[in-house]
Amino acid sequence: MRIIFLGSPSYAVHALDALVAAGYTIVGVVTQPDRPAGRDRRLTPPPVKVAALAHGLPVLQPETLRDPEVVETLRALQPDVGVVAAYGEILRRAVLEIPPLGYLNIHPSLLPLYRGPTPVAGAILAGETVTGVTIMRLDPGMDSGPILAQAMVDLPPNARTGPLTDELFRLGATLLVEVLPRYARGEIELRPQDHSQATVTKMLKKEDGRIDWTLPAIVIERMTRAYDPWPSAYTFWRGQMLRIMSAAVAPTDASATPGMVIGRSAHGHPLVQTGSDALELVEVQPASRRPMSGAAWLAGVHAPEITLG
């Protein structure tokens, strides 16, 4: 079976590695162009490119798949099926129609829930207790195609987007190589999604991470985990950004101004008034400094009153 693979970030490498280990012929790996990264803005290849070159696979890095010349290049590879894992661009019909078996996509949610670009963050923000991964066949819509297989996992109360995303793509890679042979033989009945049950996530922006202290503490605590590693949950003190790396809900009947530090926890961490309950700042990162305990940060703040905003 001739496979064309589309993916970009580190967690997409799990699927590429699994396909190579299973002995499939990868006729091409399509990934995003090298981009400037890091403080020195050095041109950096996507992790999938690094993995593909290590496997000796041909790599394509088009700026967009909408270019007709790119479409013809993909067609010339004569793939039987495509596999997509967080490539970073919705595939248009001209691309979708190239492989006879279409494109299979690994999506880190239990579709039709949490379609779109940020399903893991969406599940954490919503306080879900279970999530999972879906193998589905792409159609021209956004994560709306029929389902081949799903696997469910518990979503622990301390789950963070970065590690959970990696875990789900590992699981998805395993599920993919299990179902791919049966799919190719026509032994899997595709299950249409119930579009009436669909929920959709949005692309995150940096400002999404700014904390509104009038929100309930439980919502802000979820933000610290859902927005890790990016855009992070943050606030400001004396005009400087303060990232909230880890936090805990602290029940209180106090009625201070939201954002005001109203005391210390048993561990010495600051307790911040929110719209409902207080939030214990367990770990924070001041601007241009390393992460530190909330207690250490509070000890270095010399002010009779602290209000974050």
Curated annotation (Swiss-Prot):
GO molecular function, one term: methionyl-tRNA formyltransferase activity
Class in the EC hierarchy, top level: transferase
InterPro entries the record matches: Fmt (IPR005794), Formyl_trans_C (IPR005793), Formyl_transf_N (IPR002376), Formyl_transf_N_sf (IPR036477), Formyl_transferase-like_C_sf (IPR011034), Met-tRNA-FMT_C (IPR044135), Met-tRNA-FMT_N (IPR041711)
CDD domains with a match to the protein in the record: FMT_core_Met-tRNA-FMT_N, Met_tRNA_FMT_C
A Pfam family annotated for this UniProt entry: Formyl_trans_N
Statement: the UniProt record of this protein carries the keyword Heme: no
GO annotations of cellular component type: cytosol
Positions annotated to bind (6S)-5,6,7,8-tetrahydrofolate: S109, L110, L111, P112
Key word Cell cycle present: no
Superkingdom of the source species: Bacteria
Keywords from the named record: Protein biosynthesis, Transferase
Function: Attaches a formyl group to the free amino group of methionyl-tRNA(fMet). The formyl group appears to play a dual role in the initiator identity of N-formylmethionyl-tRNA by promoting its recognition by IF2 and preventing the misappropriation of this tRNA by the elongation apparatus.
PANTHER family: METHIONYL-TRNA FORMYLTRANSFERASE (PTHR11138), METHIONYL-TRNA FORMYLTRANSFERASE, MITOCHONDRIAL (PTHR11138:SF5)
HAMAP family: Formyl_trans (MF_00182)
Stated family: Belongs to the Fmt family.
Protein name: Methionyl-tRNA formyltransferase
Organism: Chloroflexus aggregans (strain MD-66 / DSM 9485)
